Amino acid sequence: MENVEKTSHIAPNLLNRDFTATALNQKWVTEFHVGQETLYFSPLMDLANRESIAYNFAIRPKFSLVKKMLEQGLSRIKPKECPIIHSDQGVLYGTEEWVKMLEGKAVQSMSRRGNCYDNTVIESFFAILKSECFYSRTYHSIAELQAEIEEYLVYYNQKRIKLVFKGLSPVQYRAQYLS
């Protein structure tokens, strides 16, 4: 199933705006988002350290966009871990294929329709990405835009400090958590 038009499944909002996580791979957030209406970007963020742990790009909103992102994310978890994966009610997150991919590996959660506050952490990430990466630049190709986002993700994960983590980057916080 590549072209999807209608959400067939709506999951309950398990996070209910509780964006805290006491362990890595406990709660993940994602959103299906359009940048410049020509490049689709689908990131997955771990709420424990605010690290973008998986992502994918596509030029069309096909299921393969979120499938690859989810496969990357699930490859990081240990056998007994079963994260909550919270998203908006985007069409691709309501497909039968998405629900099947999560079975036995993750628990699905969805924001209420049209309520950006139910997924505020990823919305904030997109706002930061736009202000630090897009607003002052003009991109001449999809490849240039994608390369810039990928470079920014390295910076965001490895160098961009978070006050909530006492001046550590997401990767530094994860390393400290695991030590």
Identify the role of each PLM range.
Residues 1-179:
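Charged DNA-binding/catalytic regions of mobile-element recombinases
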